[in-house]
Amino acid sequence: MAHIYRPKHHVRFVTASSLFDGHDASINIMRRILQASGAEVIHLGHNRSVEEIVNAAIQEDVQGIAVSSYQGGHMEFFKYMYDLLQERGASHIRIYGGGGGVIIPREIKELHEYGIARIFSPEDGRRLGLQGMINVMLEECDFPTVTVVTDELERLPSGDVQAIARLITLCEYRAEGENKEAAAAAEAAIEQVKALEKRVPVLGITGTGGAGKSSLTDELVRRFLNEIPDIKIAILSVDPTKQKTGGALLGDRIRMNSINSPRVYMRSLATRHSRTELSPAIRDAISVVKAAGFDLVIIETSGIGQGDAAITEVCDVSMYVMTSEFGAPTQLEKIDMIDYADLIVINKFERKGSEDAKRQVQKQYQRSHQLFDRDVSEMPVYGTIASQFNDPGTNTLFVALVDTINKKAGTNWKTSLKTVANVEKHNVIIPNERRYYLREIAETVRSYHRRAEQQVEVARRLFQIEGAIEAAKERGEAEDVIRALETLKADYEAKLTPESKRILATWEETKAKYAAKQFVTKVRDKEIVTELTTKTLSGLDIPKVVLPKFKDYGEILRWVYKENVPGSFPYTAGVFPFKRQGEDPKRQFAGEGTPERTNRRFHYLCKEDKAKRLSTAFDSVTLYGEDPDYRPDIFGKVGESGVSVCTLDDMKKLYKGFDLCDPLTSVSMTINGPAPILLAMFMNTAIDQQVEKKEAELGRPLTPEEYEQVKEWTLQTVRGTVQADILKEDQGQNTCIFSTDFALKMMGDIQEYFIKHRVRNYYSVSISGYHIAEAGANPITQLAFTLANGFTYVEYYLSRGMHIDDFAPNLSFFFSNGLDPEYSVIGRVARRIWAIVMREKYGANERSQKLKYHIQTSGRSLHAQEIDFNDIRTTLQALLAIYDNCNSLHTNAYDEAITTPTEESVRRAMAIQLIITKEFGLTKNENPLQGSFIIEELTDLVEEAVLQEFERLNDRGGVLGAMEMQYQRGKIQDESLYYETKKHTGELPIIGVNTFLNPNPPSEDELNNIQLARATYEEKETQIRNLREFQERNKDKAGPALERLKQVATSGGNIFEELMETVKVASLGQITRALYEVGGQYRRNM
């Protein structure tokens, strides 16, 4: 067991992932170990700007900041953070960081010299281990932030943030009495603070754990800021201390979107030794913020039990937050806060039974307060859905809250918000009556297999009876014996279903077809002739598809029901009869710097290919829906790890020279949060391209009617995929930017637009497990969560009135391939489950039953140590994907562990695929996995494990209910920690990383000389200049266009249809900000 350093002082850390960076797996592991080692951790989550991190660190009076940065731009990010701390007089706060192999030794050295306390490298991780790195951080930060009072009291009345923070820390020292020197200084200071106190209302918010107090607090703060001019708010948020370790997770900040305002101060406090829901320093802390000139103090407690009501002793107005899940009505009689609270909130009011719960609470409140002369409906009990943007129930609560504060505290605040009698969910994703869909799906698959197995037993008996008849005839048995057997045979034949009879009747014909020289198939009324054998150098004919040599009817049925030939239900071996000739599944990502630079890379990648299969990686600024800017933490990320695209002009430059409507051209875009905006830019690019061709052909501008014809033809012809999978973003990758319901609404709008305009060749979503795997999930979890997400989209689109066969063909999937054994069958299991469910449960047609998926080799399996070995891993993963008949494949470059791929590394990655498909002999056969005992066993094992995961998700309220409970994220993080622990202990051997180590490791100079693909300063400047030129050119049109977009969104219209127009005159960042106003920002979860 590793030694754990236990700090002598209360060490506090702010932890986060850097701006435009969703890779939070490692920082979550770090913050967990920090807590377990005794630190108080204020976790901000992913995608945090330097400004947000520094503000939080100063307000929280921490000793250290720990940030992970995996998306490039780290030099600017960390230096800017250091500079900002110096500028704001907080030079004592130490900065720690890490980014795997992305931050190379010379950059680490430069950052250390600049003043960053420590940037941990993969070598540090190997040498020190996870706990060892945490020990270094704790030991270096084990000091008090304040011991004496200097000029804090003079700076306090002006609201100086550092003065407030330091004085609250002194309040904590005073309450504990452990630091005698600090406690004495605090004693004197607090007496002076009390003399400066003003009369300020204090709102206390308390409630059960998990009731949504932080989200509700954030929504109330947003309304206070919007409704009451110039109001200044202080929030004191309390979370429990772990008595065993002394550590605490102070997690309320992560839920707050409204606090990044100069009018808001927030401080997180741990309960430490108080043994209640409040910090022992809470009264003194309230005095400090009152003296600092705030107009409202909000106290949010940790989760409480039935008998807790301490909040009422320190506030003027108290609010109790609960949900409908309190058990029997008699339980309400035990809740002290119902006796004391001024306002009671039933949050998460969309849940079943909330209306009944509200009435029960109203009755209990009426009894507790002896208000029998008033109608029960007048009791101050309010239903809210705080997670819903601009929730009418929260508006009604806010109006009542302002009225209560005015009455009890003598304020004269006004609000223009309207009240409602009934609270409803605006955009219901899964209707209540469909909430058990995942359990139904699991049962559908098992039922199919049970029926198949029953048919197998019938067919086997039939085969045995036929054999007995034949044997009896050969021996010359009596006619009555043979008649009895014939009768028995007829009985068993009658038990066969028509489908089973058809399979058996056509089996020999099927075998004959595949034994022929050629095979003719039809795809969309077009005949395709396929040669069925390939001659080896030795002169043997290798068949494309091999069928089993079964004679037993039972074995034939089992094989067809569970496996079947590629292109036939249940599509276990593949959704098409044969691979497409002349178009390998090869697809290579590109994305770096400016659109012009990436365009050149695209042309380089496919210069020798007839088929142009382009996959686009966007930089993190684009992934988060923002525009390039000179601010250092943004500037450093522009064009790093992807291409910068923020206008329609950029999109046109990106695909210049490619005919986007050529049947051999296909474009995939890896974009999620702002996907509707980028997709609108892409579709406009394709349309404008065809319009220009048509106008050149005609020698004149098109008429409006001709333009519409070209537009419709383009939409129906263009091929490609946009990722746009918002569920997996919340669960794993974290590039969510809009509130989840609003983001899903836009996904549905895209699909409705596709149906209306008959977009048949473009996938509206790529339901992705890749990023779930990259965040740390094992292969079974990846597959289960991804398929569950897919079925959730199916249920949502059906609830919007779309027909299954109108949208299912627009759904595609995306998986990772690692080296675990389960990856050998990930495609087989996915195809079989999808096909069975689509046919048996949803009544979908053949096209809708076919699950098509892209594979990318595992990025997580690429290691910064011995990077040359990565190509070996990638080769094995690519081989698995090709054996399993994936529809499209991207092979990672070996140097992606440390940089955006270079031309040399990309060429090697492409060669891996080419060698497998062109040189490796067994790939001439297209069903090499069929007939393998281990593959069949693994397929069944993985399928059942996936169905069990569906049931676990179902029991938590389906995919969305589980997301609310953080089930998926928690499971992914647990599996990530398990993997990392095994890797660090060496139990999981990783060649070149923890075993078979290089006896002559590369020197620091050699590591520093590795070629890195980075965007240049000039490229970043070019993007900003181009953006501003676009905005200037459209300055008169952008405002009205954005207003129209907001109007469509608020009126429930099709947002994507309007975006097709908006993108012509507004930039990505402008559109994103407009949509935030009407749809709300994503709220991070712990």
UniProtKB/Swiss-Prot annotation:
<dbReference type="InterPro" id="IPR027417">
    <property type="entry name" value="P-loop_NTPase"/>
</dbReference>
<comment type="similarity">
    <text>Belongs to the IcmF family.</text>
</comment>
<keyword id="KW-0460">Magnesium</keyword>
<dbReference type="Pfam" id="PF02310">
    <property type="entry name" value="B12-binding"/>
</dbReference>
<dbReference type="GO" id="GO:0000287">
    <property type="term" value="F:magnesium ion binding"/>
</dbReference>
<keyword id="KW-0170">Cobalt</keyword>
<keyword id="KW-0547">Nucleotide-binding</keyword>
<feature type="binding site">
    <location>
        <position position="252"/>
    </location>
    <ligand>
        <name>Mg(2+) 2</name>
    </ligand>
</feature>
<dbReference type="InterPro" id="IPR053439">
    <property type="entry name" value="IcmF/GTPase_domain"/>
</dbReference>
<dbReference type="GO" id="GO:0031419">
    <property type="term" value="F:cobalamin binding"/>
</dbReference>
<keyword id="KW-0413">Isomerase</keyword>
<dbReference type="GO" id="GO:0034784">
    <property type="term" value="F:pivalyl-CoA mutase activity"/>
</dbReference>
<feature type="binding site">
    <location>
        <position position="238"/>
    </location>
    <ligand>
        <name>Mg(2+) 2</name>
    </ligand>
</feature>
<dbReference type="Pfam" id="PF01642">
    <property type="entry name" value="MM_CoA_mutase"/>
</dbReference>
<dbReference type="InterPro" id="IPR052040">
    <property type="entry name" value="GTPase/Isobutyryl-CoA_mutase"/>
</dbReference>
<dbReference type="Pfam" id="PF03308">
    <property type="entry name" value="MeaB"/>
</dbReference>
<feature type="binding site">
    <location>
        <begin position="347"/>
        <end position="350"/>
    </location>
    <ligand>
        <name>GTP</name>
    </ligand>
</feature>
<protein>
    <recommendedName>
        <fullName>Fused isobutyryl-CoA mutase</fullName>
        <ecNumber>5.4.99.13</ecNumber>
        <ecNumber>3.6.5.-</ecNumber>
    </recommendedName>
</protein>
<comment type="function">
    <text>Catalyzes the reversible interconversion of isobutyryl-CoA and n-butyryl-CoA, and to a lesser extent, of pivalyl-CoA and isovaleryl-CoA, using radical chemistry. Also exhibits GTPase activity, associated with its G-protein domain (MeaI) that functions as a chaperone that assists cofactor delivery and proper holo-enzyme assembly. Also displays ATPase activity. Is not able to convert 3-hydroxybutyryl-CoA to 2-hydroxyisobutyryl-CoA. Does not exhibit methylmalonyl-CoA mutase (MCM) activity.</text>
</comment>
<keyword id="KW-0479">Metal-binding</keyword>
<feature type="binding site">
    <location>
        <position position="255"/>
    </location>
    <ligand>
        <name>GTP</name>
    </ligand>
</feature>
<feature type="binding site">
    <location>
        <position position="613"/>
    </location>
    <ligand>
        <name>substrate</name>
    </ligand>
</feature>
<feature type="domain" description="B12-binding">
    <location>
        <begin position="10"/>
        <end position="140"/>
    </location>
</feature>
<feature type="binding site">
    <location>
        <position position="763"/>
    </location>
    <ligand>
        <name>substrate</name>
    </ligand>
</feature>
<keyword id="KW-0846">Cobalamin</keyword>
<feature type="binding site">
    <location>
        <position position="852"/>
    </location>
    <ligand>
        <name>substrate</name>
    </ligand>
</feature>
<dbReference type="GO" id="GO:0006637">
    <property type="term" value="P:acyl-CoA metabolic process"/>
</dbReference>
<dbReference type="GO" id="GO:0003924">
    <property type="term" value="F:GTPase activity"/>
</dbReference>
<feature type="binding site">
    <location>
        <position position="214"/>
    </location>
    <ligand>
        <name>Mg(2+) 1</name>
    </ligand>
</feature>
<feature type="binding site">
    <location>
        <position position="719"/>
    </location>
    <ligand>
        <name>substrate</name>
    </ligand>
</feature>
<feature type="binding site">
    <location>
        <position position="847"/>
    </location>
    <ligand>
        <name>substrate</name>
    </ligand>
</feature>
<feature type="binding site">
    <location>
        <begin position="210"/>
        <end position="215"/>
    </location>
    <ligand>
        <name>GTP</name>
    </ligand>
</feature>
<feature type="binding site">
    <location>
        <position position="578"/>
    </location>
    <ligand>
        <name>substrate</name>
    </ligand>
</feature>
<dbReference type="InterPro" id="IPR016176">
    <property type="entry name" value="Cbl-dep_enz_cat"/>
</dbReference>
<feature type="binding site">
    <location>
        <position position="1085"/>
    </location>
    <ligand>
        <name>GTP</name>
    </ligand>
</feature>
<dbReference type="InterPro" id="IPR006099">
    <property type="entry name" value="MeMalonylCoA_mutase_a/b_cat"/>
</dbReference>
<keyword id="KW-0342">GTP-binding</keyword>
<dbReference type="GO" id="GO:0005525">
    <property type="term" value="F:GTP binding"/>
</dbReference>
<feature type="region of interest" description="GTPase chaperone MeaI">
    <location>
        <begin position="153"/>
        <end position="407"/>
    </location>
</feature>
<feature type="binding site">
    <location>
        <position position="252"/>
    </location>
    <ligand>
        <name>Mg(2+) 1</name>
    </ligand>
</feature>
<feature type="region of interest" description="Linker">
    <location>
        <begin position="408"/>
        <end position="570"/>
    </location>
</feature>
<feature type="binding site" description="axial binding residue">
    <location>
        <position position="23"/>
    </location>
    <ligand>
        <name>adenosylcob(III)alamin</name>
    </ligand>
</feature>
